[in-house]
C-alpha cells in the first residue's frame, strides 16, 4: 500500500532544455545616448540593426552608397500625390496598391477614373525598375518584369532605376536579404524609420562586390522573374481555354432576371422552394443562376467541389493557441495576406513540437491542395506551389484536398470571376464575412465535354506551379550567394 502511494515513489523530473542564444550587443556612442533622452535601456537601440550596418561597412569588398553621385542608382522617385476618383471596372483604369506589389500575379481590386487629375503615364511602371514601399510597411521590395510592366501603381511606391543593368538584380537581392532589410528600415544609429524617401537611399551602404558576383546574382533574379512571367502566361492560357470551351461571356454581360430593371437597387423574386434555408439576398443573386444555367448548357456535366472525383476532403482548422518559436525550431505560419506571395514575408513560425499533430492533420499544407479564406475577404483561391508544402495555415483558411488529375483544372475555374461569384454566394455573417467547408462542397464545378482540353488546362496549371517553385529556388540561390560570398565572406 505504502509503495503504491505516489508520495513515496521516485518521480523522474525532466530538466528543461535552456536554449543557448548568443548575446546581442553593440557599442553606443555618448551622443546617441543623449539624443535618446539619456536612456540606457537596450530596447531604445536596435542592436541587430546597428550590427547589420557594421557588418556591411566592414565587409571584405568595401562599400558604395546607393544614391550618391558615385552610387549605383540612376534615378529614384515617386509620382506626385493626387486625389483618387474610384469607379467601376468598365469605366476606369486598373489601379494597384503597394500591398499587391509582391504578389506573383496581382489582380486589381480598384479602378480609378480617367478624369482623375494625375498623369497615368507617370504612374505606370517601367520595365527594369526596382520598387520600394515608402509608407505603411516600408522596405517591401519588388522588381518590374513583364507581369507588372505598364500597370498603374499608387504614389506610395518608390521607383528606382540603375546606371548599370547588372546592379538591379544585385541591389534587389541585397535589400531583400535579412541584413539589407535591417539597413533599409533603420538609420545608422539603429533607429527605425517610419517613412522612406528617395533621399534616404543616399545613405544606404551596399557591398561593392566584383562584377562577376554581381552578374551571377543578377542573372538568377532575371531568370526567377522570367519564370514567374511564364507561369502567369500559362495561367492566362489555361483560363482562355476554359472560357472558349464553355463559351463564357464577360461576367458583366450575363443577362439576369431582375424583378424591376428600372429600380435604383437590384430587385428579384425567389420561390419559397428555392430558399434553401437562406433568407439573405446575397445567396439568391440572379447572376448566380445565370452562371449555373450557362454552365449546364455548355458543359458535359455540372457537379460540385464536394464530388469525390473533385476533392477528398475540405479542412478548416479549429481554433488553437499558437506557440511561436524562432525560425530554426518552427514552420512558416501563413495568413491570408501572404498567400499570393512567392516568398511569403511572414516572420511567424509555429513550433514543430507543440503543433506536431495539428501540422500533420489540419494545419500543414498538403500536395494537390487549394487554399481559400474562410473569414474576411472571401472568394479568392490559391494553388500553393511545391515549397509551400508542409508550411502551416491559420485557422482563417480552408484547404481543399484534391487530386493531381483535377486540382489544376479546379484552380483555374475557381480563380475566374465566375468561380469567385459562385463561392461568394455562400457568404454569411454580420461584422465579419464567413464561409464553411460545407458551403465550399456545394460550389458548382463544370466538367468539360472535351476531356483533352480539360486535361490541357490541368497540365498548364501544374506546369505554372512548377515554374513558380523553380523561380523561388533561383531567388533563394541568389540570397545564399549574397550572404555567403558577399556580406559574410571572409
Kindly label every feature range from the protein language model.
Residues 151-158, 190-212, 390-398, 428-453:
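A short glycine-rich beta-alpha junction/loop motif
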Residues 63-84, 99-127, 303-321, 337-367:
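Sequence-specific dsDNA recognition surfaces
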Residues 134-173, 335, 360-362, 371-413:
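A short beta-sheet element
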Residues 101, 105-107, 116-119, 131-141, ...:
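Well-ordered mid-protein domain cores that form the structural environment of catalytic cofactors
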Residues 85-93, 102-105, 109-111, 123-125, ...:
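Short, surface-exposed loop/turn microsegments at beta-strand edges and helix-strand junctions
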Residues 119-120, 147, 191, 359-360, ...:
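A structural connector/turn signal
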Residues 1-82, 210-320, 451-490:
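Non-catalytic DNA-recognition/assembly elements of restriction-modification systems
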Amino acid at each position: 500500500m505504502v509503495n503504491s502511494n505516489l508520495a513515496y515513489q521516485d518521480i523522474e523530473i525532466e530538466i528543461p532544455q535552456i536554449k543557448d542564444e548568443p548575446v546581442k550587443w553593440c557599442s553606443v556612442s555618448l551622443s546617441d545616448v543623449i539624443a535618446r533622452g539619456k536612456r540606457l535601456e537596450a530596447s531604445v537601440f536596435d542592436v541587430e540593426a546597428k550590427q547589420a550596418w557594421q557588418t556591411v561597412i566592414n565587409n571584405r569588398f568595401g562599400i558604395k552608397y546607393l544614391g550618391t553621385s558615385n552610387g549605383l542608382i540612376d534615378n529614384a522617385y515617386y509620382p506626385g500625390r493626387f486625389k483618387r476618383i474610384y469607379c467601376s471596372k468598365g469605366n476606369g483604369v486598373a489601379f494597384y496598391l503597394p500591398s499587391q506589389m509582391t504578389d506573383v500575379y496581382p489582380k486589381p481590386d480598384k479602378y480609378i477614373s480617367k478624369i482623375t487629375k494625375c498623369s497615368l503615364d507617370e504612374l505606370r511602371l517601367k520595365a527594369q525598375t526596382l520598387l520600394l514601399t515608402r509608407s505603411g510597411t516600408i522596405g517591401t521590395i519588388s522588381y518590374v518584369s513583364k507581369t507588372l510592366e505598364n500597370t498603374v501603381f499608387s504614389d506610395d511606391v518608390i521607383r528606382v532605376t540603375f546606371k548599370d543593368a547588372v546592379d538591379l538584380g544585385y541591389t534587389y537581392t541585397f535589400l531583400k536579404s535579412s541584413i539589407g532589410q535591417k539597413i533599409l528600415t533603420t538609420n545608422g544609429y539603429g533607429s527605425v524609420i517610419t517613412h522612406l524617401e528617395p533621399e534616404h537611399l543616399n545613405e544606404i551602404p551596399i557591398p561593392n562586390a566584383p562584377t562577376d558576383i554581381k552578374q551571377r546574382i543578377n542573372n538568377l533574379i532575371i531568370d526567377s522573374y522570367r519564370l514567374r512571367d511564364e507561369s502567369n502566361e500559362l495561367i492566362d492560357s489555361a483560363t482562355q481555354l476554359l472560357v472558349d470551351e464553355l463559351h463564357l461571356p464577360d461576367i458583366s454581360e450575363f443577362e439576369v432576371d431582375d424583378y424591376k430593371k428600372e429600380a435604383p437597387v437590384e430587385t428579384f423574386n425567389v420561390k419559397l422552394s428555392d430558399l434553401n434555408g437562406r433568407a439573405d439576398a446575397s445567396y439568391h443573386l440572379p447572376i448566380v443562376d445565370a452562371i449555373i444555367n450557362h454552365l449546364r448548357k455548355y458543359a458535359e456535366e455540372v457537379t460540385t467541389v464536394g464530388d469525390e472525383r473533385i476533392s477528398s476532403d475540405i479542412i478548416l482548422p479549429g481554433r488553437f493557441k499558437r506557440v511561436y518559436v524562432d525560425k530554426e525550431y518552427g514552420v512558416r505560419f501563413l495568413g491570408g495576406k501572404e498567400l499570393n506571395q512567392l516568398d511569403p514575408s511572414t516572420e511567424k513560425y509555429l513550433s514543430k513540437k507543440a503543433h506536431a499533430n495539428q501540422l500533420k492533420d489540419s494545419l500543414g499544407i498538403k500536395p494537390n491542395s487549394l487554399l481559400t479564406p474562410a473569414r474576411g475577404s472571401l472568394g479568392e483561391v490559391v494553388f500553393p506551389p511545391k515549397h509551400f508544402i508542409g508550411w502551416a495555415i491559420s485557422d482563417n483558411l480552408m484547404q481543399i484536398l484534391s487530386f493531381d488529375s483535377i486540382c489544376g483544372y479546379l484552380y483555374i475555374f475557381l480563380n475566374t470571376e465566375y468561380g469567385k461569384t459562385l463561392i461568394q454566394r455562400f457568404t454569411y455573417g454580420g461584422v465579419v464575412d464567413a464561409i464553411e467547408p460545407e458551403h465550399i462542397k456545394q460550389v458548382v464545378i463544370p466538367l468539360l465535354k472535351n476531356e483533352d482540353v480539360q486535361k490541357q488546362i490541368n497540365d498548364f496549371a501544374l506546369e505554372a506551379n512548377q515554374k513558380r517553385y523553380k523561380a523561388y529556388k533561383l531567388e533563394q540561390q541568389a540570397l545564399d550567394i549574397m550572404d555567403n560570398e558577399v556580406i559574410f565572406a571572409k
